[in-house]
Every structure is written in C-alpha cells, then in structure tokens.
Regions:
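Glycine-rich active-site/cofactor-binding loop and its immediate structural neighborhood
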Residues: 61-114
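Conserved small/polar residues in nucleotide/adenosyl-binding loops
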Residues: 134-141
Length: 142
C-alpha cells in the first residue's frame, strides 16, 4: 500500500516515511486551487468546478458552497447531491470526509480527520480516521 492508502486505513504515518514528502506536493496543488477559489467572485458553476478539481470528483449541480473554504488535501472528500457548505469551513480530509445527500454544513465548521499522537516522542507523526455526515433517515438506517 502507498502512503495515501495506509493513511486512509488509519495507520500511523511517520514523518520519516520515504513517501512523506510526496504529501507536500499534493498539498501544494490543493493550496493553489483553494487560493483560486477564495479570490474574487465566482459563479456557482465556477465554484463547483474548482471544488470538483480539489476533491477529484465531478459535483452535482445541486451542490452549493459559499467561500471562503479551506482544505489541506481534498482528495479524500466525497460529496453527495443537495449538499450545502456555508462560509468559512475547513476540511482536513486525510482520513476521509463523506457528506451524503442533503447534508448542510453551517458557517465556520471544522471537519478534522487527522491528528497527532499525544506522546512527545511520536508527536511529529500523523494518523487519520474517517468522518461521515448524513441526514436522517439515511439509506444506511434501512
């Protein structure tokens, strides 16, 4: 498994991992798109296009978001139909964020799926766990 697959699996990723520098290249790509998204006015279509590029998926025309929006990675966010994300949200998605159909996110929400161990000796390392948001009733409740 590569570093991204191991991260999604919840493994502790060490900062000495030979693949660790490749994460920074991905962060740089994402930060460029986020800066573009957060600069100036964009139509809803332009916002969806930029978010689709950040998240690596085409978005349904029913998805709406009010910038600014912040993320460090983006490739592990999945968004359903009818999702609304309000101003000033931050998604740290290395553990995976799934917003199922009809989810509304309020202003200033932080969805953080990654963390560092509390023990000082290994605090520079990172692990991630997934975040799932859905409306009730969800198809998962059936």
């Amino acid at each position: 498994m590569n570093i991204l697959e191991r991260m999604r699996a919840g493994e502790l990723i060490f900062d000495t991992d030979p693949e660790y520098p490749s994460l920074y290249a991905e962060f740089e790509k994402t930060m460029k798109l986020v800066a573009q998204l957060n600069s100036g006015y964009h139509t809803p279509e332009e916002i969806r296009d930029l978010l689709g590029r950040i998240w690596g998926q085409p978005l349904d025309e029913s998805v709406r978001m009010f910038p600014p929006f912040y993320t460090n990675f983006g490739k592990f966010t999945r968004v359903g139909r009818g999702v609304f994300i309000n101003f000033g949200c931050t998604f740290l998605d290395r553990g995976g964020i799934t917003l199922e159909d009809g989810v509304f996110i309020g202003p200033g929400v932080l969805l953080v799926t990654e963390n560092h161990p509390e023990q000082p000796a290994v605090r520079r390392n990172v692990y991630a766990k997934p975040c799932l948001l859905y409306t009730s009733p969800s198809p998962r409740d059936s």
